Amino acid sequence: DGIDYAAVTVQLPGGERGGSTGYDNAVALPAGGRGSSMLDPKELGQMNIVFEGVSKSYHDAVALVLPSLKASTYYEESLYKVINTWADIINRALTEAVAAEAAAAEDPEMETMYTK
């Protein structure tokens, strides 16, 4: 029991799963539902952690804990940057694929990686 390593779900100790990426529907973890890199030091049901690495023990993970506001802001900014980076990559790939298909439609002899 504990965290499910999928990016969008958290598994609570009782086996119940819930979303973990939406800010409005954030899952509040009970005190026993934390792993070594996901701490709730004051047992408030809040995730006050920056996910920067894997820790081997509770004591190693404590070094990752920041004050709630800083951790929340840092986590949100990092998540925002990652999402925007992936959105840009996907947008460029789709734009290139559409352009290549349009060019291939105009010239039947043209072969691209998108039309193979």
From Swiss-Prot:
Native organism taxonomy: Eukaryota, Viridiplantae, Streptophyta, Embryophyta, Tracheophyta
Note: On the 2D-gel the determined pI of this protein is: 5.7, its MW is: 35.1 kDa.
InterPro entries the UniProt entry points to: OMP/PagP_b-brl, PsbO
Species, as recorded: Pinus strobus
Organism domain of life: Eukaryota
GO MF annotation terms: oxygen evolving activity
Protein family per UniProt: Belongs to the PsbO family.
Gene name per UniProt: PSBO
One GO cellular component term: chloroplast thylakoid membrane
GO BP, sorted A to Z: photosystem II assembly; photosystem II stabilization
Protein name: Putative oxygen-evolving enhancer protein 1
